Amino acid sequence: MVPDGWKNQSPTSLFKLFSGFAFKSTDAQESGTKWLKIANVGIGEIKWDADSFLPEHFLLEHKKFALSKGDIVVALTRPTLGNKLKVARLTKESDTSLLNQRVAKIVCKDDGDSEFVFQLLRSDEFAYRINVGLLGTDPPNLSVKVLEDFTVGCPPLPEQRKIAKILSTWDKAIATTEKLIEASKQQKKALMQQLLTGKKRLINPETGKAFEGEWEEVKLGDVCSKVTDGAHHSPQSVEVGYPMFSVKDMRSTGFFENTARHISDGDFKALVKQNCKPEINDILIAKDGSILKYCFVVKEEVQGVILSSIALLRPKLNKIFPQFIAQYFSQDSVKFFVGKALTSGSGVPRIILKDFKGIHIRIPSVPEQQKIASVLTAADQEIEMLEAKLAHFKQEKKALMQQLLTGKRRVTVDIDI
């Protein structure tokens, strides 16, 4: 049923596609005017991580293909990723560029508000309709014909503008939170570089002064009673039983049991005897595949066992504070070193445990380790809080889009007096 005052129309009643120009690869330069290609169009964002440039004078010679801040572009070839359309808006003055083939500019008609159209294009329902229209095509290409094969609810322009204003407010909140997350991550990286190397010493709460004393260089195997991994064989799965965790079940602070397969009581007990059950204060590390992607400390009893894709460190608590080591192995520089120097496997890369045991690390006293870990853990918690806030904002906006873009929820349009 069409909401009162709305019309069911083809998306082409709101906008048209203006395709880019077939610039030659031989025209490319090291600098000049940005060249917007299909690879630059992401889900809701323009990505300039792979910049290409054309001569400056092309802006005048091909001015009808010039893009500027505020323009909306969409990928024409393979236009969707999952249930999202590759559509984005140029948001900066520095986004000024020339439009390449296989990308189109969205040109709104008199019946379409540009911000409303942008929100419509970003909705899951719109991407779904595009995917349906492209079924069986190879390669899938977005065209006017595809757009003419389905209809969307089109409210009057004043209502379009009000809907767009509401959804744009959520976009701003999402963008602000994303920037805060990125800033917090950069701040934490800077803290890690200072605290985990001893360049910056924290205050010892017992003395009220900065920690003192030289840091000690040790081998990982000397400060851990175990440096091992989980089971090297995989028992038969059962419907109801104990979880058997692998790398795919790891998350930043623990296991996600919903993805784990389960094994029988007998197999579980046998693997417990083989020391495949983590204990409190153990440090678990992604050993195979996504090396060091996850590294966390076991904080409560785990009623499950681990496979060999997970490494287990059991620290000597008089030498090592577990959270300090977990933070140490989460450094990008350490991940890079381990990935390059301590792995094997032409297919799936794996940490070589005998080499891993011999890795040298510099550690301060346990009290200083605890203080460093507490500061970095607080930074992690701040990031986690912001990420939870971001997820909430995105979910709220998604629910609003489903209501507002279908007319299930109507808005009050401001009337000029």
Question: Where are each of the predicted segments found?
Answer:
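Non-catalytic DNA-recognition/assembly elements of restriction-modification systems
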Residues: 1-20, 149-157, 207-229, 358
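Amphipathic alpha-helical coiled-coil/heptad-repeat segments
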Residues: 1-5, 154-210, 362-417
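A short glycine-rich beta-alpha junction/loop motif
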Residues: 4-7, 95-104, 112-115, 124, ...
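Sequence-specific dsDNA recognition surfaces
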Residues: 10-25, 41-72, 221-235, 249-280, ...
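Short coil/turn segments at secondary-structure boundaries
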Residues: 24-31, 132-134, 233-240, 257-260, ...
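A short beta-sheet element
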Residues: 37, 51, 58-122, 246-247, ...
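A structural connector/turn signal
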Residues: 61-62, 137, 149, 210, ...
